[in-house]
Design a protein with these regions (language model features):
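N-terminal subdomain of nucleotide-sugar transferases
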Residues: 1-35
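A short, charged, and often flexible helix/loop element on the N-terminal side
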Residues: 29-45, 57, 115-127
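Short N-terminal targeting/anchoring amphipathic segment
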Residues: 46-63, 68, 78-80
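Active-site proximal beta-strand in glycosyltransferases
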Residues: 73-117, 146, 166-169
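Membrane-proximal helix-turn-helix segments that form the acceptor-binding/catalytic region
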Residues: 87, 103-144, 158
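Helix-loop-beta element that forms the nucleotide-linked donor phosphate-binding surface
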Residues: 136-141, 146-147, 153-172, 179
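Short hydrophobic "strand-cap" motifs at the C-terminus of beta-strands
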Residues: 148, 168, 194-198
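Conserved donor-binding/catalytic core segment of Leloir-type glycosyltransferases
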Residues: 184-201
């Protein structure tokens, strides 16, 4: 967002939903408008108010993505979807390397989970499978998709065959590039990185 600051003619609104909110919230920081809506039913009104030239959606697996895309299309607004971490492939590999005994929970575990919610792997797998289906439905209607990698491009070709693909070489935060460097000769071997995402295996 910092790169947009010198371009005062651009107006950017970042919107999200939070079901805990009773009413819409709004604010502005560094020239960017922020909107938090209680639910996706406020998307049409938001688009009418903001009058954007483009709707850019990050996160295609949740119902809000489909709702925003539908609201934008109803107002003849172009929609660009950013993909990263495609759910189809995340679901296919969610439990890679996890022993089968840990992937299937018995009735007792499901009963306990109702009282003390956690994340049973079979429930998580079922959830990922549903999200993958929702994402495929959203991307199946897409006309414009952006991604960073060859993986993203191949996923877009499979899931959004009618869409135009726009490569976007997004990068990591500057700290990633300016931190101390390691060299194999000095270190002895490459460091082992374990980069889980949240509570996923």
């Amino acid at each position: 967002l910092a790169a947009l600051r010198p371009h005062g003619e651009l107006r950017l609104t970042v919107a999200c939903t939070d079901a805990r909110q009773k009413a819409s919230l709004q604010g502005e920081q560094d020239g960017v408008s922020y909107r938090i809506l209680p639910g996706a039913d406020g998307f049409s009104a938001l688009l009418q108010t903001e009058q954007p030239d483009l709707v850019h959606i990050w996160g295609t697996e949740y119902p809000e993505a489909a709702a925003m895309a539908d609201a934008a299309r109803a107002q003849n607004l172009p929609v660009l979807f950013s993909i990263q971490g495609v759910m189809r492939d995340c679901a296919a590999h969610l439990c890679d390397g996890v022993p089968d005994a840990y992937r299937h929970s018995g009735g007792l575990w499901h009963t306990i989970d109702k009282v003390i919610p956690g994340e049973l792997l079979d429930n998580m797998q079922a959830n990922f499978d549903v999200l993958a289906q929702k994402e495929a439905a959203v991307l199946g209607k897409a006309r414009c998709v952006t991604g960073r990698t060859g993986f993203d491009r191949r996923a877009a070709a499979d899931l959004a065959p009618a869409a135009r693909y726009y490569p976007c070489n997004e990068t990591l935060r500057p700290l990633f590039y300016t931190g101390a460097l390691w060299h194999a000769r000095e270190f002895g071997r490459a460091p082992v990185l374990f980069l889980p995402q949240g509570n996923y295996p």
